[in-house]
């Protein structure tokens, strides 16, 4: 940007000819942080996690950042390992989509790099981005009611906070319709196509 175009062209040709690769560790020592974000996902085989990865990648690229993605394989210990790894490499920030139980809370606090928790609700201080799962449940119930449903069945693991909040929204919507039955079947996994995801 500060060089004449012909000088920049000559530099780039020399870089390509010599196969020069900048030392990212040296850049970190000089500048303190990388132009990269880390993203820790619980699994790489779930559509929602893939949408998060795609959206994060697009936004990072749009703003001149790189995105490194780690698969925690539904393992809290591995998730914490990747969080610590990304912290140690001085990322500009880390996003994590934890496997959330109703009693979930952030494992790490007061970190030198901003952490954003995705698809999770928490009252503790921090950065969180999540859908309104209770409103989703209400909308689902309202649609079922509008279509004449007499019985609503929800299949999923009650241990997951998102499902708990959706069921709460369904119950609230059904409060005015006591004749409609709701049944929750605690089965399946959150990340398999066979379970409707």
Predicted features by range, described:
Residues 35-36, 66, 151-152, 180-181:
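Charged active-site motifs of nucleotide-sugar-dependent glycosyltransferases
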Residues 116, 175-176:
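Venus flytrap/periplasmic-binding-protein-like
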Residues 1-34:
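N-terminal helix-turn-helix DNA-binding module of bacterial transcription factors
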Residues 6, 24, 42-51, 69-78, ...:
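Hinge/beta->alpha junction and helix N-cap segments in small-molecule ligand-binding domains
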Residues 18, 63, 111, 177-178:
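Helix C-cap/helix->beta junction micro-motif
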Residues 15, 60, 171-174:
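Conserved hydrophobic residues forming the short capping helix/wall of the S-adenosyl-L-methionine
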Residues 145-150, 175:
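Secondary-structure boundary elements
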Residues 32-146:
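Alpha-helical recognition/docking segments in bacterial nutrient-uptake
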